[in-house]
């Protein structure tokens, strides 16, 4: 290990660093520090985009779907049923459909949770409003 100073990022909580101990060929114990990444650091690094995965997956899914369609069309235009290129095309096609379906499912689940939160906050407002006029 080097004796360089470790630069701390201001404003982030210090997380405990797990230690991995190993023995090398000479019988010496080597200690390796493995830093943990907290949720705050992850949110800062990604710009808060870690909860919007379904929006990031859609462009990749469309590209994979188009690629799968083209490869499958080329493979079947040469009547190469069961060849490697036709299997690759079908795999890409099904992967694109799977990615689109999973992003749509994630979007639907997120919309439901937003509706539930909105409904819950409206219920709280109505209860508070009844208390004012009672």
Curated annotation (Swiss-Prot):
Gene Ontology CC: one annotated term: endoplasmic reticulum
Phosphoserine is found on 15, 121
Q: Which UniProt keywords apply?
A: Cell membrane, Cytoplasm, Developmental protein, Differentiation, Endoplasmic reticulum, Membrane, Phosphoprotein, Transmembrane, Transmembrane helix
One Pfam match, by short name? TMEM100
Q: Which InterPro entries match?
A: TMEM100 (IPR032536)
Q: Does the keyword Ribonucleoprotein apply?
A: no
Please list every transmembrane segment annotated in the UniProt record, as residue ranges: 56-76, 84-104
Q: Look up and give the membrane topology term.
A: Multi-pass membrane protein
Q: Where in the cell is it found?
A: Cell membrane; Membrane; Perikaryon; Cytoplasm, Perinuclear region
Q: Biological process (GO) annotations?
A: angiogenesis; arterial endothelial cell differentiation; BMP signaling pathway; epithelial to mesenchymal transition involved in endocardial cushion formation; in utero embryonic development; Notch signaling pathway; positive regulation of endothelial cell differentiation; positive regulation of phosphatidylinositol 3-kinase/protein kinase B signal transduction
Which top-level group of life is the source organism from? Eukaryota
Function noted in UniProt: Plays a role during embryonic arterial endothelium differentiation and vascular morphogenesis through the ACVRL1 receptor-dependent signaling pathway upon stimulation by bone morphogenetic proteins, such as GDF2/BMP9 and BMP10. Involved in the regulation of nociception, acting as a modulator of the interaction between TRPA1 and TRPV1, two molecular sensors and mediators of pain signals in dorsal root ganglia (DRG) neurons.
Q: How does it assemble?
A: Interacts (via C-terminus) with TRPA1 and TRPV1. Interacts with TASOR.
Write the protein's name. Transmembrane protein 100
Give the organism, scientific name: Bos taurus
